[in-house]
């Protein structure tokens, strides 16, 4: 493997797992200090209540089998890494201000979630239920949710209309579950008008999912069995910026002539597929990952999104391709890098071959 660095550093466009929602500190700073004078500072004996963070309750890593009674002042509840099997209404009777619940790494099943208990948490913004025993997306959910994390469960079903009222949801993480194509219907994601990040990686999909919300910016579909990109698929998600399709079964025949020639896509990851040639790309693309495919040669004249003549004289035309990072290792390509690649992509900072 050879890396050619054309510039001293590679600027990353954005963090892979970032979504643009309020942080805990931002929400915490909204509080009026006098707010706490209305509450007593009781603390469940199994948990820790930091004096400097009075609206947080830490009950993680305690071997708990059930959720303790939550004091009324609590906004942030940490219950991860326990043995909890059920979510009942009783512990939350006074917890009307909850914004954040972390229940990752427990033993919660769908049958263990009392009907309606989650939807009654009307101020909840963040719900973490990763690494549990869920077989379907729990319903109903709080209408104000901004992030829903359900990774590494056993989810194979998504109830009809479960997301229809979640207009504020910006991030939905369903990666590493048991989802088949049949679980994702044309109306599955209906209502998710604010969604920006959708993660369905590490499932059992053979097709691109139907009806992705139009405002989606980051779409993660790694580690599925997807073979085909439908014609004009990305016209329905015109804002998609970051697209991951690593570890699928994409071949040259499964990609339409201009399947990835999409001006919004800035980071395209197609590693570990079955491609023998580089698909056409858009001049706006900045990062392209094509490592571990079956590519034998690279023709810069063919893959250049503008004519080589224009690229050579980009100062005159002002339409230089923006590609900065190109990864081609794990293919059958031998150095050196063709000169026409360097002529076309004059902003390249690194090429891995």
UniProtKB/Swiss-Prot annotation:
The keyword Repeat applies. Glycans are attached at residues 94, 168, 223, 261, 299. It is found in: Secreted, Extracellular space, Extracellular matrix. Binds keratan sulfate chains. GO terms for cellular component: extracellular space. Residues 34-72 form the LRRNT domain. The keyword Metal-binding does not apply. It comes from the Eukaryota. SMART domains: LRR_BAC, LRR_TYP, LRRNT. Keywords: Disulfide bond, Extracellular matrix, Glycoprotein, Leucine-rich repeat, Proteoglycan, Repeat, Secreted, Signal. Pfam families: LRR_6, LRR_8, LRRNT. LRR repeats lie at residues 73-94, 97-118, 123-143, 144-165, 168-188, 194-214, 215-236, 239-262, 264-283, 284-305. Its main location: secreted. Disulfide bonds join 43-49, 47-59, 304-344. Residues 1-21 form the signal peptide. Belongs to the small leucine-rich proteoglycan (SLRP) family. SLRP class II subfamily. Plays an important role in generating and maintaining a transparent matrix within the corneal stroma. This is Keratocan. It comes from Gallus gallus (Chicken).
